[in-house]
């Protein structure tokens, strides 16, 4: 009975023997995903600039299954070091989850936007993703296998939901994802991105101006298309787990929406009307 239980446990681990590097892994989506990947058997390297939080995540996961690397994704040497450190520690890199991202102050008029803010967002959200892709590919191409996932956004395919800098940067993430999927397919490397709905992470709260988590969730639930289930960061982590696992072995170049159908809605033309029950 115990042997059967152990076998079932091993089968349930969808990333057994895999090694993952997660940028922005010290909080929010990255932290939750790091913990989930570890639960599914992966060794996880957490890269971030939030050192104290990063070390706390490693302590929560366990030092035998995770490590923390200080990494500013806008610095190529830092990204290169994070990749090399991961390979040196665990022997390989199977999964690169490029998740680090920022936003700028929410100024609705472009004439009020600052060039410095725009460049800062692109530096992290676009250049950072590019560097993670580049250095992941550097070690994955010789192995002829690997999996690169990036965090995009609903703003990767629609306008009006975020600042110009953030929207433009996430469109760029999707473009990089599709282009790299074409290049790296010949090596058996999959490249995908995730586009989540609004979440009460530090980034989401900062951009929306809503600090109270319950209030944030209520706003999202009211605005959302799919009523009933509450959207949370675990939903995004589970989507990342799917893309990272062999269950998605033939999925590449895909932008996976975790938005309850919001991105396909037309909020102006409302054909489907039910009387209040």
Curated annotation (Swiss-Prot):
Domain of life according to the entry: Eukaryota
Pfam families given in the database record: adh_short_C2
Keywords on record: NAD, Oxidoreductase
GO molecular function: secoisolariciresinol dehydrogenase activity
Coiled-coil blocks: none
Catalytic reactions on record: (-)-secoisolariciresinol + 2 NAD(+) = (-)-matairesinol + 2 NADH + 2 H(+)
Positions of the catalytic residues: 166
Chain sites annotated for binding NAD(+): 24-29, 48, 73, 99, 170
Binding-site list for substrate: 163
Gene3D superfamilies membership: NAD(P)-binding Rossmann-like Domain
E.C. no: 1.1.1.331
Keyword Repressor: no
GO biological process terms on file: lignan biosynthetic process
Subunit structure and binding partners: Homotetramer.
Assigned protein family: Belongs to the short-chain dehydrogenases/reductases (SDR) family.
Biological function: Oxidoreductase involved in lignan biosynthesis. Catalyzes the stereospecific conversion of (-)-secoisolariciresinol to (-)-matairesinol via a lactol intermediate.
Protein name per the record: Secoisolariciresinol dehydrogenase
The species this protein was found in: Forsythia intermedia (Border forsythia)
Lineage: Eukaryota, Viridiplantae, Streptophyta, Embryophyta, Tracheophyta
């Amino acid at each position: 009975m115990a042997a059967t239980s152990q076998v079932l446990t091993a089968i349930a681990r969808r990333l057994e023997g895999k090694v993952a590097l997660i940028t922005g892994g010290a909080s929010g989506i990255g932290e939750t995903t790091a913990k989930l990947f570890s639960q599914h058997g992966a060794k996880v390297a957490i890269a971030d600039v939030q050192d104290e939080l990063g070390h706390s995540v490693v302590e929560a996961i366990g030092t035998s299954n995770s490590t923390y690397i200080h990494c500013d994704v806008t610095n190529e040497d830092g990204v290169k070091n994070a990749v090399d450190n991961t390979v040196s520690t665990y022997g390989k890199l199977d999964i690169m989850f490029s998740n680090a991202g920022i936003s700028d102050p929410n100024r609705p008029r472009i004439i009020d936007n600052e060039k410095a803010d725009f460049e800062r967002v692109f530096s992290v959200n676009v250049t950072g993703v590019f560097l993670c892709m580049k250095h992941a590919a550097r070690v994955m191409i010789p192995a002829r296998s690997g999996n690169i996932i990036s965090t995009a956004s609903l703003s990767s395919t629609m306008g009006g939901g975020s600042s110009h800098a953030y929207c433009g940067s996430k469109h760029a993430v999707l473009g990089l994802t599709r282009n790299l999927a074409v290049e790296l397919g010949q090596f058996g490397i999959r490249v995908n991105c995730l586009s989540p709905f609004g979440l009460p992470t530090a980034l989401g709260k900062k951009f929306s101006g809503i600090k109270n988590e319950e209030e944030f969730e209520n706003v999202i639930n009211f605005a959302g298309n799919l009523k009933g289930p509450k959207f949370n960061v675990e939903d995004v982590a589970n989507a990342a787990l799917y893309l990272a696992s062999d269950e998605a072995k033939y999925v590449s170049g895909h932008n996976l929406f975790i938005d309850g159908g919001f991105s396909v809605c037309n909020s102006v033309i409302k054909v489907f009307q039910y009387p209040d029950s």
